Amino acid sequence: MQDKNNLCWLDMEMTGLNPETDRIIEVAMIITDSDLNVLAQSEVYAVHQSDDVLNKMDEWNTATHGRTGLTQRVRESSHTEAEVEQKLLDFMSEWVPGRATPMCGNSIHQDRRFMVKYMPKLENYFHYRNLDVSTLKELAKRWNPPVAKSVVKRGSHKALDDILESIEEMRHYREHFLISAPRAEAQ
């Protein structure tokens, strides 16, 4: 099942944007082939954090994660960051050899910053490159605004939904923004 051309898509929800003071509270992964066909998806993991950590969330995170039910799921979860890291490593290694896939998603550098701090073995399994859909979004805004405006975002702020939305957005840019030439077999 391992294929070096498979892509691993990831999304995390965090208590805030600063890995020095905030923590991971939800994470999920999806594996696609190089044509963006979904091959597998991980479990969606709510990562337990203490009330002390959750009570430090700002207004936006408190409201958003409260509305989605994530805050309650985090309180009820028994999954630690280390346990989730190992489960995701096990899942990922079934589909992709180590350091083969870029980390794929939207604003994925932010997830990577948290991974370096709280899930370093998982971060190390990825290639050092990122496939960041938000880069295409920023380019489309500047070079082809109608393409950028035609992307429909739901913004649920749930890890699995956000990954699926990122894959769909990448498909959109592939079809409407990237120039397609006859495809040679990947080497």
UniProtKB/Swiss-Prot annotation:
Q: Name one GO biological process term.
A: DNA metabolic process
Q: Which CDD domains match?
A: Orn (cd06135)
Pfam name, any one: RNase_T
Q: What is its EC number?
A: 3.1.15.-
Enumerate the active-site residues. Answer: Y128
| Top EC class of this enzyme | hydrolase
| Protein name (record) | Oligoribonuclease
Q: Which organism is it from?
A: Neisseria meningitidis serogroup B (strain ATCC BAA-335 / MC58)
Q: Name the lineage.
A: Bacteria, Pseudomonadati, Pseudomonadota, Betaproteobacteria, Neisseriales
